[in-house]
Structures are given as structure tokens and as C-alpha cells.
């Protein structure tokens, strides 16, 4: 299963990331990658984030991995939308593909190519829900952790003696 994310569309739609982009787009991109990395870990899906670089003179398409995520920058003259459409075309026959974008035109195109769509708001809501589930799960695991139990502090011989005493009752 794949989630393809229209990077700048999501950054511009999420107010928490928009604040970062005012300082630097690089910082906003890093924060998006960080958020989606934990989301990917919980969901167990392959996430590809696509960023526009079509205005970069002489720019070639760049692909690299950032932890479990794949990051793609479009080449000069090619929009992120075009890269997303190409990926959907390549992947949709053999896998479930969902595209995260609030671009209405892009949603129509990817739906026509056999992919699902999720808006920026829907992705944000799911991300918040996943973060809460991770937090609750972590809290529960901390509550169940019992360091320094008696069994961990005594020798094997002492455990045998105590077990024998317990059985005599």
C-alpha cells in the first residue's frame, strides 16, 4: 500500500507547517518528513513525498530515502502533480495507492487513474489520531513495566528455595 503526498500542497494546507515555511521551506519540509515518518511506522505503508522543483534551472529529478520515506523532487519543467500522476500510473495496477492533496484538479486526475485520494485536512486528522494512539500505547507500556522485581534481584538458588516454601502451604 502506498501513500503519495503532494509535499508543498500539504505544507501550505497545514497551519502548523505554514508557520515553519515563513522562516524556511527547508524547515517546513523537514517537519513534514518527521511527522510522516512516525505516521508511516504506525500505519505500515510506503510513503512517497513529492516536492516541486520544476522552476530550478537545470534541475534533475532527485530521489532519496529519509528513513522509511521516499522523497522525490521533480525535475526542471515537471511539476509535482506530473510526478504524482506518473507514480499512480506505475503503481495502481499492483498496489493500493492513495494520494494526499487538496488540489481538486489533481484529485480528479488520480481518481481517474485508479488511485484513492485523501485531502490535506483528512490526512491531518488521521495523523493526529495516530499520534494519540502512539502516545496511549506508550503510556500503557510504561505502566506495565516493573523494573527490579524480586525475581530479578535474587539468585536462581534463592528462587528455588522460595518456590519450595510456596508449595508447602
Model-predicted segments: where are they?
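Nuclease catalytic cores that cleave nucleic-acid phosphodiester bonds
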Residues: 1-3, 9-169
Amino acid at each position: 500500500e502506498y501513500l503519495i503526498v503532494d509535499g508543498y500542497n500539504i505544507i501550505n494546507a497545514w497551519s502548523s507547517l505554514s508557520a515553519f515555511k515563513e522562516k524556511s521551506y527547508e524547515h517546513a519540509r523537514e517537519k513534514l518528513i518527521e511527522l510522516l515518518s512516525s505516521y508511516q511506522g504506525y500505519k505500515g505503508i510506503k510513503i512517497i513525498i513529492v516536492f516541486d522543483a520544476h522552476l530550478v534551472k537545470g534541475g534533475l529529478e532527485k530521489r532519496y530515502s529519509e528513513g522509511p520515506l521516499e522523497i522525490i523532487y521533480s525535475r526542471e519543467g515537471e511539476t509535482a502533480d506530473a510526478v504524482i500522476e506518473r507514480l499512480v500510473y506505475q503503481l495502481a495496477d499492483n498496489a493500493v495507492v492513495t494520494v494526499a492533496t487538496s488540489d481538486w484538479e489533481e484529485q480528479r486526475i488520480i481518481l481517474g487513474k485508479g488511485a484513492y485520494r485523501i485531502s490535506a485536512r483528512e490526512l491531518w486528522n488521521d495523523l493526529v489520531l495516530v499520534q494519540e494512539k502512539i502516545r496511549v500505547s506508550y503510556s500503557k507500556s510504561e505502566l506495565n513495566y516493573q523494573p527490579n522485581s524480586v525475581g530479578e534481584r535474587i539468585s536462581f538458588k534463592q528462587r528455588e528455595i522460595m518456590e519450595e516454601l510456596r508449595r508447602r502451604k
